[in-house]
Amino acid sequence: MAELEIFDNGVSIEQIIPALDRDGAVIIRDLLSMEITTQIIEDLSETLEASTPGSKSGIESWEEFHGGKTVRFCGLAAKSRAFVDHALLNEYLIKVSDHYLLKSCADYWLNTGQVMAVGSSEPAQYLHRDEDN
């Protein structure tokens, strides 16, 4: 597996694209400020506390992969204005999406904004595409 390249916030999109092409992902340090991160966590904490850990699929292989102590939930845009303003509408996300998607379409939208709160002692997941998308 490739070691992901780490960039500082403020780097140009032109510097990021070659690493994305090569590795499929990058890390951008301090993409969201601590203040914004805290706000998103506060916005989502009630849903996190109310969510049951583990897979709801009933399929043993998915249950093992998802982890019995990990909580997942979607619909972040409806639960956190800070998520919309600072993550969903983040300049890097938009520029990267435009770079790759607008070559073959007139418009696009994000299908899922999801929290995955990995429980203690859960095994790490490898970098992967969901459902091979």
Question: What role is predicted for each listed range?
Answer:
Residues 1-22, 29-132:
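Non-heme Fe(II)-dependent double-stranded beta-helix
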